From Swiss-Prot:
Protein name: Threonine synthase
Assembly notes: Monomer.
Pfam annotation, one family: Thr_synth_N
Keyword Lyase: yes
Reactions that this protein is recorded to catalyse: O-phospho-L-homoserine + H2O = L-threonine + phosphate
Gene: thrC
The keyword Ribosomal protein is assigned to this record: no
Species of origin: Corynebacterium glutamicum (strain ATCC 13032 / DSM 20300 / JCM 1318 / BCRC 11384 / CCUG 27702 / LMG 3730 / NBRC 12168 / NCIMB 10025 / NRRL B-2784 / 534)
Keyword terms, alphabetized: Amino-acid biosynthesis, Lyase, Pyridoxal phosphate, Threonine biosynthesis
Record-level GO BP terms: threonine biosynthetic process
Amino acid sequence: MDYISTRDASRTPARFSDILLGGLAPDGGLYLPATYPQLDDAQLSKWREVLANEGYAALAAEVISLFVDDIPVEDIKAITARAYTYPKFNSEDIVPVTELEDNIYLGHLSEGPTAAFKDMAMQLLGELFEYELRRRNETINILGATSGDTGSSAEYAMRGREGIRVFMLTPAGRMTPFQQAQMFGLDDPNIFNIALDGVFDDCQDVVKAVSADAEFKKDNRIGAVNSINWARLMAQVVYYVSSWIRTTTSNDQKVSFSVPTGNFGDICAGHIARQMGLPIDRLIVATNENDVLDEFFRTGDYRVRSSADTHETSSPSMDISRASNFERFIFDLLGRDATRVNDLFGTQVRQGGFSLADDANFEKAAAEYGFASGRSTHADRVATIADVHSRLDVLIDPHTADGVHVARQWRDEVNTPIIVLETALPVKFADTIVEAIGEAPQTPERFAAIMDAPFKVSDLPNDTDAVKQYIVDAIANTSVK
């Protein structure tokens, strides 16, 4: 399987094991398979049997083997078996699917170690990184940015692993107390939390700036686990497959997905699954007040907001005004025209955005690629949480409420079951839950102690050079071997 950059018109091929540890391509683009594997009826039938008889980890090995041909299949099976286990995940199904109400289902992605859907990819990445580093006798320094859940998922997946340090940037004061406690309370000598004076997009910009410095990246062995890393999307494709299987009984049945998203990572995996031939009807983008993606799918205008115009909302993991994975979809939408994508994302996005409203390709977003969208407000979230709790006796977090609210908007127009992809357990967003139902969510027993742990975090200015120096100093003063 060859991989190409979204900005490389020459389509220089790369191998999976090389892009696994790197993140961004050298030209600043994002990696995608040169061609998507194609599924047929026999493959889908086989996967139904694998999930039923062998479980999620075995299905994951089947899916991932389509994208990875430079790791032996038996090793892939061992890696997925370690990544997706019970009781590491709180359900033997790993990703259960339950019916919420008429034609709307919940895909439970928050059964993992940090109660967030990011665990689905991060647990696999932890195993893959350690495997590949050991194979190469190398070390890596993972640099990432998080608006909430990515950081804790990455840190719990990478802690204690041979050859790995983690440097995670967070927007100072913009995460919930539970999210801060999960990250900052983690006691591991090779986990480094950095609270940056800015919003999430500032953190993401610093990560991209550091990664774009080829010399610094090489000298300090910088890698990435944010959703720009292809392996994360690859891992997420698996639960689209498993959720489709659990919701249907025959291969000609389609489903739709309503996906809360800010960074376009989770739903990009759905796009890839659909391109492979998984029977998906609609991919519904659910945003909060930071609705840059909803605006694009309604109008064709991709208008990046400034930090000052990025709203602080009650679904904070989606408080993103520049969707870093969106480039992958636009690459496909524009017929894989890397020269044009390079102009759009290398130049025009830096100047505030671009418009495809008058481009004939824009109509394909809905007609050919199945996308739809909607937005949710704080009032919508609170009302949805309260309604789902009082009528259905189910408690959902604010981001999942965004997904349910938007799914309900589309239910009458979509003739398939809609699976809302859960993003986190309610305990991570207690203030909003209290506002919605009048009481705090119960803290699962496995998380009871984290709120009392002392914090380990460094405050830094919104400055790339300051972050670089911090990384250099930390590497010099710690060992991962």
